[in-house]
């Protein structure tokens, strides 16, 4: 896994409700995947929504992985049919995300690289989104937050006798689908270290920094923008134990 991809991609489907998934047998290094959700979030989705109807957010995806020797590659395409009763999404086109990635294990460590193109996605997903990328009109409570763009991330894991050193660096360029002057460029990097205390217990630490350069709406219903440059940093320390 690549540390930091959620911070620079435009769509992450990590957890979904009501999913049917299929994984094909691996043949000549290729493994195919497919999944579908008739209601991606039954607890926090739109009220009065009905599963497998246009009132809910529906999702589908296809993926393929190729693994042979030191090389592993993946490709996925994901589709989102947004709810037609949520004010923010009822007029939006279907969302799409195409992701390509891979890693290669060298003698010194493993190198990771991944990229994603996304279009008509509802909100940028990263938890450290300091300033929402949105357009607000006075006449409507709805916020236009449909975004498009692309992101890249590269990572490195270097194993040593004392543990693993981890590094990642990524960027994202995004804009509102209907208001291209409202946009954001992000650069994010992180370093980490994990040390196995035993076969079941691992201690880990990491530090990261994220910088945004954004053109945001200066006032509700205004077409004027103002440049803001928020940033965030964090340090974590933790321990995991497998039972």
Residue ranges and their predicted role:
Residues 190-214, 228:
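C-terminal closing repeat unit and adjoining cap/tail of repeat-based domains
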Residues 28-29, 161-162, 197-203:
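Short loop/turn motifs that connect adjacent beta-strands in outer-membrane beta-barrel proteins
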């Amino acid at each position: 896994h690549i540390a930091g991809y959620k911070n620079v991609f435009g769509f992450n489907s990590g957890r979904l409700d009501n999913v049917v998934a299929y994984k094909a047998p691996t043949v000549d290094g290729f493994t195919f995947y497919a999944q579908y959700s008739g209601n991606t979030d039954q607890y926090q989705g739109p009220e009065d929504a009905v599963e497998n109807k246009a009132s809910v957010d529906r999702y589908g995806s296809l993926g393929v992985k190729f693994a042979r020797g030191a090389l592993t590659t993946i490709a996925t395409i994901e589709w989102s049919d947004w709810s037609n009763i949520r004010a923010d999404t009822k007029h939006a086109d279907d969302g799409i995300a195409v992701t390509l990635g891979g890693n290669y294990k060298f003698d010194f460590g493993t190198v990771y690289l991944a990229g994603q193109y996304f279009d008509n996605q509802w909100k940028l997903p990263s938890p450290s989104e300091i300033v929402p990328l949105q357009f607000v009109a006075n006449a409507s409570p709805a916020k236009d937050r449909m975004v498009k763009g692309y992101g890249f991330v590269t990572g490195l894991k270097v194993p040593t006798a004392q543990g693993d050193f981890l590094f990642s660096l990524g960027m994202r360029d995004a804009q509102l689908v209907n208001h291209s002057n409202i946009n954001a460029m992000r650069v994010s990097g992180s370093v980490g270290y994990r040390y196995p205390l035993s076969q079941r217990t691992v201690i880990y630490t990491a530090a990261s920094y994220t910088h945004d350069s954004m053109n945001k709406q200066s006032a509700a219903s205004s077409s004027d923008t103002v440049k803001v440059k928020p940033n965030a940093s964090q340090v974590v320390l933790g321990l995991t134990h497998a039972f």
